Amino acid sequence: MNTLKLRDYTGKALSECTILELYNAALALTQDACRNRGYNSGKKKVYYISAEFLIGKLLSNNLINLGIYDDVKAELAEAGKDITELEEFEYEPSLGNGGLGRLSACFIDSLATLGLPADGVGLAYHCGLFKQSFEDRKQHTRPDYWRKWGMANWMKRTDKHYKVQCGDLELLSTMYEIDVTGYGSKCGHLRLFDLDTVNERLIGSGIDFDKKEIEKNLTLFMYPDDSDEDGKLLRVYQEYFMVSNAAQLILDECVERGSNLHDLADYAAIQINDTHPSLVIPELVRLLTEKGIEEKEAYQIVTDVCAYTNHTILAEALETWPKHFFKAVVPHLMPIIKRMNDAVKAKYEDPSVQIIDEYGNVHMAHMDIHYSHSVNGVARLHTDILKETELNNFYKLYPEKFNNKTNGITFRRWVIECNPELTELITEKIGEGWKTDARQLEQLIPYAEDEAFLQCILNRKNTKKHKFSAWLEKYQGDKVDPESVYDVQIKRLHEYKRQQLNLLWAIDRYLHIKDGYRPRRPVTVFFGAKAAPAYVIAKDIIHAILAFSSIVNNDPEVSPYLKVVMLRNYNVSMAEKLIPASDISEQISLASKEASGTGNMKFMLNGAVTLGTMDGANVEIAELVGEDNIFTFGQSSEEVIEHYKNADYVAKNWYKKDKRLAAAVDFLVSEEMLEAGDRKLLKQLYDELLGRDWFMTFPDFESYCKTKDKALAAYEDRMGWAKKMAVNIAKAGYFSSDRTIDQYNNDIWHLEKDC
């Protein structure tokens, strides 16, 4: 029973408190509740090291997990206050970017909920990625000073400090902790490292800053612009600072728990989340040898402790750094890396598997694979592609290391918190058990034939659509029709995710309406995406979307039937509002390029129907829901891989033979678009599509248009559509991050649960 009361933390009547005072009181209450619950502990602990933890707002999530949300809500209501005011007041931590960061956040939630001793380990960025705005129909960036808005109060400064040597530069870290609440269980920690010397006043125009002053800039931004050498070096500094702190923390804690370091694998499991934390491997070797362990034994210890998760099929995202970078930043590690590479060369003659290639580049993924005991992909298709093509040479060496762990999401945030209306309906039908055992959602399958239940699902979706419509108008002034189909693509802007394909469909529909077509129901196309500041074509795609939206939304002949909305500064909080309101989930990456995706799972759980390629986790979604409850299109991954292998794809050939496609592409540089947008940027995008189209937008265009037409037609059968929604919700249980984490633990970490 909860004995903590909000009024005990204010010193005066709640009715007399400001929002800030109430927020700080709620924060203090949750921190005390966490301490009362206790923290998961045990002999062996997993350290989940990641450059990103996109945790989202914490207040409501923590109150729900601690079982006191309703109590606090009621106490506020008695004082004439609304808990939603506190939720809106809260500022979102800027500690991540896209799917990688959201996955990390879901995983630490599940680790805590399942009672597994675990810490997330990363960096305490001051300004995160950036805050996005739109001016002149272009993306503009500015610092996201999230730590100045009270959110830093969640982040408790500790008295732990570590020295990190980077060449002649000695850095002294400070560790911060954020409580990670488990749902009905004990808590965990997110450990974040920072430098006290970092100075936000170093930031000039936009997000520009002096990249050479490492002591002042190290943790200013996540993923600093690496289009020049200083930016690349800064990334190496960041990565080493993160893992050196992590390695020192891990060894200290394991010794405290009784390890003699020879038996480190009995006390620690390290999950390397993508290649950013890869330097933890040679850093651990260095620290172990400094403590008297022979280097050869240190290699084996580190291999037994470390496991690597690969998150990408894109070669560009598999980090490779020139050797001279390491000589500049971590000269003390370079001899270790060279000896590790010599050990690989002595064992395997194949030059393609060496850590240091013939050009002197250090391949981080290669180091991870050789010196980890487990290598996993994040969806079955992704893992198969790694084994069969992208990492086939490594798979032949270490078939026993490779395994699949299909990603998952935390249902606590992605339905219980963000969609209480649907949560209430599910619980009414099948009870509370699904909240901790998501497989129980399967019990909803019989209700897919129950018209009363289906009408309830439609009603709740309609409620969320109206709420989002009202919020959007208040937030950025866009008016949308809640009776329209909400067609949603919200994810990081990248050519392989193919926002440009969705844009071409919208242009095609616009041209069709201008020719006299009158759709039965309007469609609102939502985009939400940030483009990396140095990613020119991604920024051009955003510009084209904004220019086109200004045309279509202001055309009285078209806007009653089609609207295009580009959401400003898309983040977790916005996703929590839009995903429950969405009808169609756009998951249209080029087959073979998306490792998994997790947005697809969040949409599915909230009753949106997927329109997607057979890529990433879409393949597993399709198998679970059946072909009647998903809309798939496009080339297969095998066909795409074959095109790349043969280098036989020519964009212009597709453009010439498809008049509908050509008309949509040509519209990018039409008089209307050039008047609305920037000629240079639109021409760049046009030329890129016609001259290269590296992610094969054109071959999938016809199939995409036909399939979306099919989806929009199916939407008109409201009971038929509701059945698709019900099946998707019922089958979403497999994609719980609790299931994923259980698999990691059973197959890789072998921790004992503290529950």
What function would you assign to each model-found segment?
Residues M1-C755:
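A conserved ligand/cofactor-binding region detector
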